[in-house]
C-alpha cells in the first residue's frame, strides 16, 4: 500500500507492508493526501518486520533510547534492536523497521513531521508550537508547553460555532507573517465526555517516552477547519498555568513575547520530530542549522510585527479561560469590520 502526501508542493510517498499503519497515517495527514503524483521529493518506506542487521560502524552518538551511526549519506538510528530507521539524505529516502505496531507508527509519524518541518522552512514556512483558531478574519495563536492545556482550551472554544480550527498544536507561519492551517489531529489525555469533540472517533496513541494519548483526526470536523490564510488581524498569546485563582488575559508589549517565541517557534520545543535525524557533527550541518534558525526568526519577526500580544495566566476554570480568549477575538473582529 502507498500514500501520497503534499505539504506545500513537497510530495512525500509513504509505503508500507502493513495496512493498519498506513490507515492511521492517512487519517493523521488527511488534509494533505492526494491520489497520485508525477514526481516525489521524499520516500518513506515502513516495514513491519525484524530490523535488518547493521553493518560494522562506530556510533557517532548514544542517547537514552537509541544509538546513531553514519556511513556516507546514510544515517542509522538503532532503537536498541526494537526498531531501526535508515535515512539516506542523498536519495531522500527513509526506511523504518519494527515488529512492534505501536513503535512503528510512532517513529513513522515523527519522521514525516521531521522531514516536512525542514522542507517547509526551505520554502519560507515555519511551524509554531501553539493552538491556532480563527474567528472571521481574526487568527489567534496560544503558545503553551506540552501538557499545558492547548487541546483542553480547544474543546471549550470549539463549542462556539463561529470558531474554526487552524491547528491543535502546530499552525504554520510564512515569511510575511501570515498564518496557514495545519489540521492534523487533536490529542487529549482522556476522551472528552461532552461537547462537539465527544462525538468524534478516538484512537489510543501509545508513545515510548511519554504517557499514552487519545487522538482524533480533524477529517471528522471538515466544516470546522479554517481554509483561508490569515494575517491582517492576529492575537498572539503566551500562556502560563496558575495553581489556583482567577485567570487573567493581559496585553503586553511585543518585546515580552521574544522569549516565548524563541521557545515555541525558533527552538520549536514541543514540535513533533525525530531529533536524532538532525543530530549532526560537521561544519556544513552547523551552517544549515544557522540557516533554518534564520528562516524561523524572519517568520517569527513578521508574525510578531502584525500581532496584538497578550500574557495569559490560566486558572483552573476552563470555560472561563476559553471565554476570555473569545471576548478578545470578538473585540478585535468587530473593531475591524
Where on the chain are the PLM-derived regions?
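A noncatalytic interaction/capping subdomain that flanks phosphate/NTP-handling catalytic cores
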Residues: 1-146, 159-164, 172-337
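Conserved lysine of the Walker
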Residues: 150
Amino acid at each position: 500500500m502507498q500514500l501520497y502526501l503534499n505539504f506545500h508542493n513537497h510530495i512525500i510517498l509513504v509505503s508500507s507492508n502493513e495496512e493498519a499503519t498506513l490507515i492511521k497515517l492517512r487519517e493523521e495527514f488527511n488534509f494533505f493526501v492526494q491520489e497520485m503524483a508525477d514526481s516525489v521529493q521524499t520516500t518513506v518506506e515502513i516495514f513491519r518486520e525484524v530490523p535488518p542487521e547493521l553493518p560494522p560502524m562506530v556510533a557517532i552518538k548514544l542517547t537514552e533510547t537509541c544509538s546513531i551511526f553514519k556511513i556516507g549519506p546514510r544515517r542509522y538510528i538503532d532503537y536498541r534492536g526494537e526498531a531501526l530507521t535508515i535515512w539516506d539524505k542523498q536519495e531522500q529516502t527513509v526506511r523504518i523497521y519494527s515488529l512492534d505496531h505501536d513503535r512503528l507508527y510512532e517513529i513513522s509519524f515523527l519522521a514525516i513531521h521531521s522531514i516536512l518541518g525542514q522542507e517547509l522552512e526551505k520554502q519560507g514556512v515555519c511551524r509554531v508550537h501553539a493552538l491556532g483558531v480563527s474567528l472571521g478574519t481574526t487568527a489567534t495563536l496560544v503558545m503553551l508547553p506540552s501538557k499545558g492545556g492547548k487541546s483542553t482550551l480547544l474543546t471549550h472554544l470549539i463549542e462556539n460555532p463561529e470558531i474554526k480550527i487552524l491547528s491543535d498544536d502546530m499552525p504554520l507561519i510564512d515569511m510575511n507573517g501570515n498564518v496557514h492551517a495545519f489540521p492534523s489531529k487533536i490529542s487529549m489525555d482522556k476522551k472528552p465526555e461532552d461537547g462537539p469533540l465527544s462525538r468524534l472517533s478516538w484512537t489510543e496513541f501509545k508513545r515510548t517516552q511519554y504517557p499514552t494519548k487519545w487522538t482524533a483526526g480533524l477529517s471528522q470536523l471538515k466544516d470546522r477547519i479554517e481554509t483561508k490564510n490569515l494575517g491582517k488581524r492576529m492575537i498572539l498569546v503566551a500562556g502560563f498555568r496558575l495553581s489556583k485563582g482567577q485567570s487573567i488575559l493581559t496585553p503586553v508589549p511585543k518585546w515580552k513575547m521574544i522569549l516565548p517565541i524563541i521557545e515555541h517557534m525558533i527552538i520549536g520545543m514541543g514540535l513533533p520530530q525525530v531529533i536524532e535525524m538532525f543530530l549532526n557533527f560537521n561544519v556544513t550541518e552547523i551552517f544549515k542549522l544557522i540557516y533554518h534558525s534564520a528562516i524561523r526568526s524572519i517568520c517569527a519577526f513578521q508574525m510578531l510585527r502584525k500581532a496584538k500580544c497578550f500574557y495569559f495566566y490560566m486558572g483552573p476554570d476552563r470555560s472561563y479561560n476559553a471565554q476570555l480568549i473569545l471576548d478578545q477575538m470578538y473585540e478585535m473582529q468587530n473593531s475591524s469590520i
